[in-house]
Amino acid sequence: MLESNYTMPTEFLFVGFTDYLPLRVTLFLVFLLVYTLTMVGNILLIILVNINSSLQIPMYYFLSNLSFLDISCSTAITPKMLANFLASRKSISPYGCALQMFFFASFADAECLILAAMAYDRYAAICNPLLYTTLMSRRVCVCFIVLAYFSGSTTSLVHVCLTFRLSFCGSNIVNHFFCDIPPLLALSCTDTQINQLLLFALCSFIQTSTFVVIFISYFCILITVLSIKSSGGRSKTFSTCASHLIAVTLFYGALLFMYLQPTTSYSLDTDKVVAVFYTVVFPMFNPIIYSFRNKDVKNALKKLLERIGYSNEWYLNRLRIVNI
């Protein structure tokens, strides 16, 4: 450990979930399956949106960006976590820790803004259909995306810089499975009040404001839906809105629970369980909740599979001709 006014360990050690090897192997297999499904589902959605002309609209443009963020957010955490399940020494360098913290926080904050943009897009389409092309023009969509990535990167960089200016002259054992801000603040032997206040302020602003936008948008949508005379149209829209609201509530609930509580009441074991859901599990379910229940996406997927099947059939026929 470096001895100076600014003290930083040469490495951080993760406690992880358990030291019992059979359970670690089981968790490795479970999370490997979850990560694989996350990658396949989100990559497939991105491909569908980009190759299908019927999906070239703002809603699916935001969905493809959400899928990219889910892939990125999960990739920032899961590969290292999987490696640590099978490693005897679950360590990470300070630079690796800083990078992991930066990328995860960037993608998580950007995802909050993308979810808000998606809710606003649905509000514009259902509540103001005549103004939809103006409210959700290509320029507006690009501005939403740029704002999401820029604000996510900026706030994340601030957190990382302030966190790694602290001294860690005590233990270097992180009771977590990745480098997150609260457990590192708990390890510091210097005053972390500024860090805690800034974490609370930025998280309150980004997470609370975007959640309010989402809630108001869906509330207006539901009010509009109540005026629909067709019971079938009402039930379909209610079903879609309900699934989206449940997913958003769970995602934001986990984030608010993690980052808007004081360090003094920080429960390491409880927060690890909560963190698993928003870092590993939610990215797997987002494509199902937001996309694959959608008729347009199902049709696009069906056409893609038919195209692949036709290509394979054509290739096999060519092989038969050559063999003859």
UniProtKB/Swiss-Prot annotation:
Residues 1-25, 76-99, 155-196, 259-271 are extracellular. Disulfide bonds join 97-189. It comes from the Eukaryota. It is found in: Cell membrane. Keywords: Cell membrane, Disulfide bond, G-protein coupled receptor, Glycoprotein, Membrane, Olfaction, Receptor, Sensory transduction, Transducer, Transmembrane, Transmembrane helix. The keyword Membrane applies. The chain crosses the membrane at residues 26-46, 55-75, 100-120, 134-154, 197-217, 238-258, 272-292. It holds the Pfam family 7tm_4. It is a multi-pass membrane protein. Residues 47-54, 121-133, 218-237, 293-324 are cytoplasmic. One of its GO terms (cellular component) is plasma membrane. Glycans are attached at residue 5. InterPro entries: GPCR_Rhodpsn, GPCR_Rhodpsn_7TM, Olfact_rcpt. The keyword Glycoprotein applies. One of its GO terms (molecular function) is olfactory receptor activity. Its main location: membrane. Coiled coil: none annotated. PROSITE patterns: G_PROTEIN_RECEP_F1_1, G_PROTEIN_RECEP_F1_2. PANTHER family: OLFACTORY RECEPTOR. Belongs to the G-protein coupled receptor 1 family. Odorant receptor. This is Olfactory receptor 5AS1. It comes from Homo sapiens. The gene is OR5AS1.
